[in-house]
């Protein structure tokens, strides 16, 4: 019987691979300690965070992940905000990102979430094509403002 890949909840043992995926696929240089701390924290907050990994069972290796946070506001129904979707470059184009998003959407629907939204930098044209190919529509162009509180 041929082994298959699977989508599952993230585990602390995934930290090293998640760190690598964040660095290579998203361009975020982050310490292993930070990744471990965040996996622990977010895994315990199941009412507000959905964090799934795609594991290639044949290779016994995590090759991608999706992370979404519950989006609540005074002016809309509950939704999800995608905070990260990443797949290692050598595994891109194989439907992994699509499977992760579908898995997330099914679980969100089961939890009565009414929409999923995400932001993507304007230069990430290939990512935009991907999101459109799985049914997402660009409904707004905006700028991000940030203020550091340290």
What are these model-predicted stretches?
Residues 5, 9-16, 20-78, 83:
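Acetyl-CoA-dependent GNAT
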Residues 10, 85-87, 120, 136:
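Hydrophobic adenine-recognition pocket in adenosine-nucleotide-binding enzymes
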Residues 49-51, 140-144:
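Short hydrophobic/aromatic beta-strand or adjacent loop that forms the aromatic wall/cage
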Residues 87, 93-106, 133:
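Conserved acetyl-CoA-binding loop-helix of GNAT-fold acetyltransferases
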Residues 101, 108-120:
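Conserved GNAT acetyl-CoA-binding A-motif
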Residues 106, 143-150:
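Terminal substrate-recognition subdomain of acyl/acetyltransferases
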Residues 118-127, 146-149:
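Conserved beta-strand-loop-alpha-helix junction that forms the acyl-donor binding cleft
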